[in-house]
Regions:
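C-terminal motif of bacterial Sec signal peptides marking the signal peptidase cleavage site
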Residues: 13-16
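Bacterial signal peptide processing site
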Residues: 18-21
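Domain-level detector of nuclease and nuclease-like folds
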Residues: 137-246
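Bacterial N-terminal signal peptides that target proteins for export
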Residues: 1-6
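Cell wall/extracellular polymer interaction/catalysis modules
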Residues: 33-141, 146-149
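Extracytoplasmic/lumenal low-complexity Ser/Thr/Pro-rich segments of cell-envelope proteins
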Residues: 24-35
């Protein structure tokens, strides 16, 4: 137990990582990870490892295209009836069937702990993050974050909830919608400005400004769509393939 006034500091340690990280902006063949960029989505199919490392090798791009090519396509349906509350209250810890559920910590703080470095918690807590450092895969920038300016880091739904609603989630039961909204596979802490710019866009309308991460982003989008049996629009699928050399 922490004494009052104490601050717990946690440094993120990645198994198999070297202190030097990756050279340049590239991922490693067959996936891999680095201390700065985190883990390639190709070796993190459930989203429980930190970061979103770039994919750049021809072999990895081919693997990415194979995944994306299997996605079904359909037109985007109406937004009628969509409301954020249809996916449960924000950052609920009780969405059964997803990693980190019912661990006593809300989804937002789970994500900050998972992806942040030099994490500091509120005194007496091992959940509430009050400061950290974050490499933002969307912008390629390092962020020094403090809870006093919480909006500088926001949690992005890789497949936006409104997008999912229009692509079929409107017909799901509430439990499945709650899983999508709180599944770490579909969540990344990123800069608030990037998240605000994305809104509910699919890949054809918005991609991370950091070009090195775009194939990885497409892979993560495809992983979520595959897991939840969501189709994507034809233009989104085409753009995703293009980011991975297609």
């Amino acid at each position: 137990m922490l004494r009052a006034g104490a601050v717990l500091v946690v440094g993120t340690v990645l198994a198999g990582c070297t202190g030097g990280g990756l050279s340049g902006e590239s991922g490693t063949a067959g996936g891999g990870s680095s201390a700065k960029y985190g883990t390639s989505p190709l070796t993190d199919p459930d989203g429980t490892k930190p970061g979103l490392a770039p994919i750049s090798s021809g072999q990895d791009e081919a693997t990415a295209r194979e995944l994306i090519s299997k996605l079904q396509t359909k037109g985007r349906g109406p937004k009628t009836g969509y409301d954020r509350d249809e996916f449960g209250y924000a950052w609920m810890d009780t969405a059964d069937g997803v990693p980190l559920a019912r661990n006593g910590c809300d989804t937002r703080n789970d994500l900050l702990k998972l992806h942040g470095r030099k994490v500091q918690f509120r005194a007496g807590s091992d959940c509430v993050v009050v400061s950290m450092e974050l490499y933002d895969p969307y912008t390629g920038k390092d962020i020094v974050w403090k809870k006093a300016k919480a909006a500088e880091v926001q949690i992005d739904h890789v497949v936006p909830l409104s997008y999912a609603w229009q692509m079929g989630a409107a017909r799901w039961g509430k439990e499945k919608r709650q899983r999508l909204a709180n599944d770490v596979l579909n969540l990344l802490p990123v800069s608030g400005s990037a998240n605000s710019a994305k809104r509910d866009s699919g890949p054809a309308s918005w991609l991370p400004p950091n070009k090195a991460t775009r194939c990885s982003y497409a892979v993560r989008f495809a992983q979520v769509a595959k897991k939840y049996e969501l189709p994507v629009t034809a233009s989104d699928k085409e753009m995703m393939l293009k980011q991975c050399g297609g």
